[in-house]
Amino acid sequence: MSIFPIALALLLIGLEEGEAARDGYPLSKNNNCKIYCPDTDVCKDTCKNRASAPDGKCDGWNSCYCFKVPDHIPVWGDPGTKPCMT
């Protein structure tokens, strides 16, 4: 028995058309850096407005981290994004 069909099935479980998204740090409009996060409520609002993401939280370094960012929205570290200019 080949393991390929099993591996393919496991990869496809839970994926529906249009569901593609990833997690990441939204970019600041001013300098392409991660956005400062004073608290999780502010981050959740930032994620909704800047990254079209349904949820987010502050990470350990006071940066806003968003969940389920649509693929067409750039996040920090994406190929082709400009470097952070602090």
From Swiss-Prot:
Expressed by the venom gland. GO terms for cellular component: extracellular region. The keyword NADP does not apply. Residues 22-85 form the LCN-type CS-alpha/beta domain. InterPro entries: LCN-type_CS_alpha_beta_dom, Scorpion_toxin-like_sf, Scorpion_toxinL/defensin. It is found in: Secreted. Disulfide bonds join C33-C84, C37-C58, C43-C64, C47-C66. Keywords: Disulfide bond, Ion channel impairing toxin, Neurotoxin, Secreted, Signal, Toxin, Voltage-gated sodium channel impairing toxin. CDD domains: neurotoxins_LC_scorpion (cd23106). Pfam families: Toxin_3 (PF00537). One of its GO terms (molecular function) is toxin activity. Residues 1-20 form the signal peptide. Its main location: secreted. Belongs to the long (4 C-C) scorpion toxin superfamily. Sodium channel inhibitor family. Beta subfamily. Beta toxins bind voltage-independently at site-4 of sodium channels (Nav) and shift the voltage of activation toward more negative potentials thereby affecting sodium channel activation and promoting spontaneous and repetitive firing. Has the structural arrangement of an alpha-helix connected to antiparallel beta-sheets by disulfide bonds (CS-alpha/beta). This is Toxin Tpa6. It comes from Tityus pachyurus (Colombian scorpion). The lineage of its organism: Eukaryota, Metazoa, Ecdysozoa, Arthropoda, Chelicerata.
